[in-house]
Amino acid sequence: MKIFRSIDITRKQITSIALEILVLLPCLFVFVSAHSLAQDTRYNDNESASSPVGEVSLVIGKAFLSSANMRGLRVRSGDFIREGDTIRTESNGHVHVRFIDEAVLSVRPRSELQVLAYRFDEANPENSLVKLNLLEGTARTVSGEAAKTARERFRLNTPIAAIGVRGTDFVVSATADSLKALVNDGAIVVAPFSTQCLQGGTGPCNFNSVELGGGSMQILE
C-alpha cells in the first residue's frame, strides 16, 4: 500500500523560498567559479612558478599543456610557456609558440615536445641556453637570437639523436626508433646518442655527426 503525505504550502511560504533561492544562486555561482579556477593552475598565484619563456600564438584543434604543477590543460592562444612545460597535440592539433628571443616553434599533429630549458640572456646572448626534447611527432623550429648567438648551447633531443643548429629553420619528425630532418635554411648537426653524445648534454655533438644544409634531408634509424 502506498501512502501519500500532503503538504500545504501557502503563497507567502512559496515567495519566501523563491527569495532564498535568488539570494543563494550568486553565492553558488561564485563558489563554483572559484573552485574551477583553483583546479586550473594557470589562474593560481604561484610564486614558485618560473618566468614565462614564450607565448602560444596559435592553436588549431586539440592540444594540451602539462608541467610539474599542471596536468593536461587545453592549450589556448595567449597561454604562457615556461621551462619544464610539455606540449602534446592530438591528430588535429597544431600549436605555434613565440619565445622571448623571437624564436618560433611549431608543434604539429600527434606530437609531444618538452621545453627543458630556455634561458635568453639579452645582455650577454652568448650565455643563453636552449634545450628542447621532441618525444614523438613533428616540430619545426625557426631560430631566435639565443640559438643564433649561442650555437654551442642549443640542443633539440629526439629519442635516438641530438640536433644542434647553425642559425636555422628546420623540421624534425621523430619516433622511438627513427628520425627524419629537413633543413629549410641554415644548417643542423645530427648525431646519434652514444657514450660521446649523451642526452643530458647541451649543444651539438661532433662525434659520428652529420651536418645538413638548406634543402637537404636526413633519415636515421
What residue spans do the PLM features occupy?
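Bacterial N-terminal signal peptides
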Residues: 18-31
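N-terminal secretory signal peptides that target proteins for export/translocation
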Residues: 1-16
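Flexible, surface-exposed loop/linker segments and immediately adjacent secondary-structure boundaries
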Residues: 36-95, 99-221
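Generic detector of N-terminal low-structure segments
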Residues: 6, 31-33
